[in-house]
């Protein structure tokens, strides 16, 4: 507050994004990537089992859905998913855009975007998900080093339970699972029939067939 409104205030603004949902705060990951946390994205964890690599980028309470999707993918589809916590999609987009602008002005190749740096060592498709519109996740598409599928709450709203709304917008764990399988199908790693069966069995078109993020154990 002092930096924003004090006598020697600076041209900056601090804000807090608050989600209307009670969740357990996960424990701090071992060897936390503090730079990544501050700049917009860090690797949270990778599933212990599975042979097909894939990646889930999630923000806010979407991280819980990503972790639940990670469990389903490992247990039912032999997918070893890495989960990334995105602390700021906008910062990542601004970083990439600033590098592109600097390169244009100098007539040189752009330096590597921070998002690319964080993701380039991970194999498989990438799925980006948040409770906001997909436009938010789409901002970093140029900097994702692989096939990228985005899930978000596009539309005019949906009045129901949190779980029902996430199923309606397809931002819940089950929808993430199918999006990851879709990415793997595009890479030829799984058959199209696997994706179709998963979408059908997980009832992605039924907002009443849902489970809760509260089912996720504290990590």
What are these regions (language model features)?
Residues 1-219:
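Thiamine diphosphate
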């Amino acid at each position: 507050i002092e930096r924003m409104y004090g006598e020697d205030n600076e041209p900056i603004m601090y804000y807090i994004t608050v989600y209307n949902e009670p969740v357990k705060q996960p424990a701090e990951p071992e060897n936390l990537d503090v730079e990544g946390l501050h700049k917009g994205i860090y690797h949270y964890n990778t599933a212990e089992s599975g042979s097909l690599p894939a990646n889930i980028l999630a923000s806010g309470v979407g991280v819980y859905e990503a972790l639940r999707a990670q469990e389903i993918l490992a247990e039912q589809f032999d997918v070893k998913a890495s989960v990334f916590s995105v602390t700021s999609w906008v910062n990542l987009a601004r970083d990439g855009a600033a590098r592109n602008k600097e390169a244009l002005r100098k007539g040189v190749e752009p330096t590597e975007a921070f998002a690319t740096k964080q993701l380039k060592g991970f194999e498989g498709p990438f799925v980006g998900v948040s409770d906001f519109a997909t436009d938010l996740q789409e901002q970093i598409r140029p900097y994702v080093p692989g096939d990228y599928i985005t899930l978000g709450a596009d539309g005019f709203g949906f009045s129901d339970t949190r779980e029902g709304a996430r199923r309606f917008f397809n931002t819940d764990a089950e929808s993430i699972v199918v999006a990851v399988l879709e990415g793997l199908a595009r890479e030829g790693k799984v058959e199209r029939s696997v994706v179709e069966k998963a979408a059908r069995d997980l009832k992605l078109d039924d907002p009443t067939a849902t489970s809760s993020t509260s089912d996720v154990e504290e990590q």
